[in-house]
């Protein structure tokens, strides 16, 4: 009998606790009074982020649409990742990680530090431009880093880089000179270019417009006044 009584008391306590939770869930008590946005936000429109919070996060903290808010922030182009969580009794915390743009993707999008393409506006002159097929942005970013390391030793940078449909690489330097590397031995060809630049091409940099490295052991050049490439050391 004593055992049954104890069991009934436990059940009653559980029912009361459950009823209390249901009551709190359906009541206007425990309202959200504060939304805390956290993260190093440089490019995002904070007003827009605040509006997203107001749209989804309101009312009873137990019923507020955490999942909806999370999905809305994920759709915002500048946000790479988001975590939305309740902080009882009255606060919802939104932790945001912002994308860091490293290049332009064509004329209307950007590439972040992970090689992801996203559509957003950014007024920052001097960013390199990537041109390639869909799905090649991560590979282009990797190659950009490799090419830049080699070119930097000669004080050169990349203005634009193209990865063609035939998997060939074309690099436009920050001085306007175009370098064609082709689709094989790209790093070897780029190093050969930097050697030629150091010992031969630099002195004509103001006239030089095009260098074709797609030769076995040499290259061809085109000057601004030329109609056709002038071949050098072609084999």
Curated annotation (Swiss-Prot):
Question: Which membrane topology describes this protein?
Answer: Single-pass type II membrane protein
Q: Which GO terms describe its biological process?
A: division septum assembly; FtsZ-dependent cytokinesis
Stretches assigned to the Cytoplasmic side:
1-6
PROSITE patterns (UniProt xref): POTRA
Residues in compartment: Periplasmic: 26-235
Instruction: Show the GO cellular component annotation of the record.
Output: cell division site; FtsQBL complex; plasma membrane
**Domain POTRA: start-end pairs:** 30-99
Protein name stated in the entry? Cell division protein FtsQ
Outline the subunit composition: Part of a complex composed of FtsB, FtsL and FtsQ.
Q: What is the native source organism of this protein? A: Neisseria meningitidis serogroup B (strain ATCC BAA-335 / MC58)
The record lists the membrane-crossing segments as 7-25
The UniProt similarity line reads:
Belongs to the FtsQ/DivIB family. FtsQ subfamily.
Q: Where in the cell is it found?
A: Cell inner membrane
Keywords, ordered alphabetically = Cell cycle, Cell division, Cell inner membrane, Cell membrane, Membrane, Transmembrane, Transmembrane helix
Tell me, what does this protein do in biology?
Essential cell division protein. May link together the upstream cell division proteins, which are predominantly cytoplasmic, with the downstream cell division proteins, which are predominantly periplasmic. May control correct divisome assembly.
